[in-house]
Amino acid sequence: MMFDITKQFSLVGKVALVTGAAYGIGYAIAKAYADAGAKIAFNCRSQAHMDKALADYKKDGIEAHGYICDVTDEEAVRAMAADIEQKLGTIDILVNNAGIIKRIPMLEMTTEDFRKVIDIDLTAAFIVSKAVLPGMLRKGHGKIINVCSMLSEVGRETVAAYTAAKGGLKMLTKNIASEYGDRNIQCNGIGPGYIATPQTAPLRTPGHPFHEFLLSKTPAHRWGTPEDLMGPAVFLASDASDFVNGHILYVDGGILAYLGRNPKG
């Protein structure tokens, strides 16, 4: 019997929930899953974002099911997961993508600011995973993909809460893989580098010191795009990654591998 590698990457018949998928990275991942054959559900927090997202999905030929849901609200998340299961079937693929960043020097950051980032970027992934895992366990298979960051590995000024949250998300990923791997659950992470999204717009102005710094530190010598994450996300959601567990796949243009150019040549 011939082995068809293309079938390993198919998501036909799968149900995927992508949090924070109204635009940017989440939207690109949801679109990739739809292109690979999955049924798509997503959430966002405002009606304005929902209306635009549904119009964008429709324009791209995708029938997406949208929910206005605060992913830090356990009751709302459980209700969303139950509704998805009733309408689309058991959730096979969960992408914990919802997140925020606050760029504030640590000594100027309030505890409230710190907690808000932790709640949305880390605690929400725990809440949504906890709501979705029982269905995956009943079905005997599931994929959880946590959108981590290159800042899961390294620090940088003004983003103490974000690095703490993303470092924690990396370890939550490994723990879920360790705890449920024997029940055919694969939990992995994607660690984007600096991606051209609305969150990074203030840093991407040509001539901005950080823009020039980033290009000098990235072997690919460019900002990433949401589309750069589509292939890796499909891989981690597909049967092709069934023996990959607890791994963080960094999609960063090589920045974590690069110490910098020797000024002496």
Model regions and ranges:
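Conserved glycine-rich Rossmann-like NAD(P)H-binding loop of the short-chain dehydrogenase/reductase
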Residues: 38-52
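Short, small/polar-rich loop/turn modules that mediate ligand/substrate recognition or access, typified
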Residues: 95, 181, 186, 244-246
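Alpha-helical segment proximal to the catalytic Tyr-Lys
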Residues: 134, 178-182, 242
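Active-site helix of classical SDR
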Residues: 129, 165, 173
